[in-house]
A protein has these predicted regions:
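Hydrophobic beta-strand positions that form the internal "hydrophobic ladder"
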Residues: 182, 226, 270-271, 311-315, ...
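Amphipathic beta-strand/beta-sheet edge segments enriched in Tyr/Trp
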Residues: 33, 99-166
């Protein structure tokens, strides 16, 4: 599907070799531009976001205008689609700039190289915040989006992220990932515990406090709970945690391994590896941990399941060929097909939410790197290389970003990159120690705990 709005960016963007903005004209009077988020050639779109204009209220609070603009700028930069202009090059004081189409001097912004401009204004009354945010097409001097919000001061960040999501929807046809979270394992306390953070690494919360090892967090499709592996009894057992209560409840404490949980895409059940029969096999469990079905039956070790988004297939790791490789199980036929043939050790598959690609970590030249392959085994591509061990990849819910752990700077920490392997950068987590085993949440509709 293509998403569009505005026409005359063609000349400018062709000169810049953008390819990210594609021009489409359905009718002469209603032409639009759109951002092709699937383009393999992506040039970041220059966008100007001056400090929000203070419109009055209870006292003067100009610093908040900068905070609001910075929050939006940082969120859009995280997406990898936008390049924010340095406020130092702006030609006017933001408090003297216009905020409406009639007041804005588009020629100045075009001179600075901006393709898009966001102008925001705000009012404060007690603990209430009023916001008006406008998105402009600088080239065509058009208002593209206007949103008005009335909220609490404490919800300022979430409101700005809501606008960022709306902006992405308007530009690309898809909501952004700005109301998502990540779960991961951290050892800041000296023990491996489960943590949550916002998509960009902010708002860190420790979820488990068992003074024992907790591993492999996995999000439920509705974002209301996570499953994980806990060692409270000294054995790897499966737990689920309702995020509203932050209480972990055991669902499988069978003898041996109870590991590698992953939720069925439509919820209500999950796949996991159990070894109570003596051999690690994949099983389908209901929400209470009761076995619905044994998915694999063989002498080998079968672990690390990852669902296709339609729930009809499952990627997993098996050593049935003598070395760990990625296989795909068709649940309808109950047949498994080997997916990977390159490399002697491939693990941690992650199926794209779009269904078209599978990530995994493979041992290459003595180090683990992230690879991507089509579900039919074609178009194998290496995404990381030459910088430490890169493992445990997972997808953002829109399939555009990849989160993974890397020890390229020493201890393992979390990194993010575009789906094509570009723009690799460390996630900003204000947390000591290592961070491993990330999992990205679905889009969330309520505030995080």
């Amino acid at each position: 599907m293509r998403y569009c709005y505005s026409r005359n960016l063609r000349a400018s963007l062709l000169c810049l070799s953008a390819f990210l903005l594609v021009i489409f004209q359905a009718f002469p009077a209603a032409s639009r531009i759109y951002i092709d988020i699937n383009s393999p050639l992506q040039k970041k779109i220059p966008i100007a976001i001056p400090r929000f204009h203070y419109e009055g209220g209870d006292g003067v609070n100009l610093s908040m205008g900068k905070d609001l603009a910075d929050t939006l700028n940082n969120a859009l930069a995280f997406s990898g689609l936008f390049q924010g202009l340095d406020p130092a090059v702006f030609l006017q004081d933001p408090e003297k700039m216009g905020v409406t189409k009639e007041e804005i001097k588009f020629s100045e912004w075009r001179f600075l190289g901006a393709d898009l401009l966001v102008r925001g204004s705000y009012q404060i009354q007690g603990q209430k915040l009023g916001l008006v945010i406008r998105l402009f097409d600088v080239i065509n001097q058009k208002l593209l989006l206007k949103k008005i919000y009335a909220t609490d001061l404490s919800a300022a960040r979430q409101t700005i992220l809501t606008f960022a999501d709306e902006m992405m929807l308007h530009l690309t046809g898809e909501l952004g990932i700005f109301h998502t979270q990540i779960a991961f394992v951290g050892d800041a306390t000296g023990k491996k515990e489960i943590y949550l953070a916002d998509f960009d690494g902010s708002h860190i919360r420790q979820m488990t406090r068992d003074s024992d090892m907790n591993l492999a967090p996995a999000w439920a499709p509705d974002g209301k709970e996570i499953s994980y592996v806990g060692y409270k009894r000294g054995n790897p057992d499966l737990y689920t945690m309702d995020l509203s209560t932050k209480v972990g409840e055991p669902i499988s404490m069978r003898p041996g391994l109870n590991i590698a949980p992953t939720y069925y895409p439509k919820g209500g059940k999950l796949a996991a590896t159990l070894s109570f029969t003596g051999n690690p096999e994949l099983y389908l469990l209901d929400a209470k941990g009761d076995i619905l079905k044994q998915l694999t039956i063989n002498w080998s070790i079968d672990v690390s399941p990852s669902w296709a988004p339609d729930g009809q297939k499952l990627a997993y790791v098996s050593n049935r060929a003598g070395i760990p490789q990625i296989y795909v199980l068709d649940l309808a036929t109950e047949r498994s097909t080997r997916l990977t043939f390159e490399g002697d050790y491939n693990t941690s598959p992650a199926w794209s939410p779009r269904g078209d690609r599978i990530l995994y970590a493979g041992l290459h030249d003595g180090r683990f790197d992230i690879f991507m392959i089509n579900p039919d085994g074609t178009e194998l591509r290496q995404l990381t290389g030459g910088e430490g061990n890169n493992e445990n990849p997972c997808w953002s819910p829109d399939g555009r970003l990849i989160l993974f752990q890397s020890d390229r700077n020493g201890s393992p920490t979390l990194w993010v990159m575009q789906a094509n392997g570009t723009d690799q950068r460390r996630l900003r987590l204000n947390l000591n120690g290592s961070q491993t085993e990330p999992d990205w949440s679905p889009r969330l509709t309520r505030a995080a705990p």
